């Protein structure tokens, strides 16, 4: 039912996030917490795919912990549910955001001849050069950049921006946040990103 409500907003895609490791989410069995209940994760995925007429994608992690690295089997099962793409974060839930992302299993999923859907790699990509290296080494179809964009929205630029150009981008980000959220929350949201900015 929730997916049908979301579909009324005419999204291009509905992405199911089974990757959020935050305790208040995962401890309730949501986000990466779903990795401890794969049958339910698959049932939810199948039902959402059946309920909507837009592509459904999934984002998840390698597994719950290093003893439960389930992504190679899970990728096939999710594809069988009818998803159109799979984003894999190269850490387990128990790692949260610590340590280094392990792209080895992401590469294994991509090289699996049974996998026909696009595989999107995620984790520890902080520059276009690192994204290019991930494409080259792991043959992923796309790379998702997350936290590295905080305070650094020019990360996607192919050339180094001057200080004035960076300030201009940050001003534009503030303008957009105020326009699309509201003045108070837009400023607070922008401040959080500015705190992470290397400017």
Predicted regions and their residues:
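Short glycine/serine/threonine-biased micro-segments
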Residues: 17, 29-31, 61, 88, ...
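Alpha/beta catalytic cores of nucleotide-metabolism and tRNA/nucleoside-modifying enzymes
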Residues: 43, 51-53, 67-85, 97, ...
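A short acidic, helix-capping loop that chelates divalent metal ions and anchors anionic groups
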Residues: 22-28, 92-96, 154-155
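Short secondary-structure boundary segments
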Residues: 31, 87-102
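Short glycine-enriched, charge-decorated loop/helix-capping segments at active-site entrances
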Residues: 29-35, 95, 159-161
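Active-site beta-loop-alpha junctions enriched in small/polar residues
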Residues: 19-21, 59-65, 91-93, 122-126, ...
């Amino acid at each position: 039912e929730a997916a049908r409500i979301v579909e009324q907003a005419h999204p291009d895609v509905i992405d199911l996030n089974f990757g959020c490791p935050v305790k208040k989410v995962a401890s309730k069995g949501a986000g990466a917490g779903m990795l401890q209940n794969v049958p339910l994760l698959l049932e939810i995925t199948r039902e959402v795919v059946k309920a909507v007429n837009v592509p459904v994608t999934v984002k998840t992690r390698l597994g719950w912990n290093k003893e439960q690295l389930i992504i190679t089997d899970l990728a096939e099962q999710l594809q069988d549910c009818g998803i159109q793409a799979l984003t894999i974060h190269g850490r387990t839930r128990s790692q949260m955001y610590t340590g280094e992302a392990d792209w080895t299993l992401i590469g294994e999923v991509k090289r699996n001849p049974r996998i026909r859907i696009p595989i999107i790699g995620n984790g520890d990509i902080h520059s276009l050069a690192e994204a290019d290296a991930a494409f080259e080494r792991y043959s992923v179809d796309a790379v998702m950049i997350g936290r590295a964009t905080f305070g650094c929205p020019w990360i996607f630029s192919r050339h180094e921006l001057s200080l004035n150009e960076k300030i201009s981008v940050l001003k534009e980000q503030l303008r957009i946040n105020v326009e699309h959220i509201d003045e108070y929350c837009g400023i607070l949201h922008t401040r959080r990103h500015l705190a992470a900015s290397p400017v």
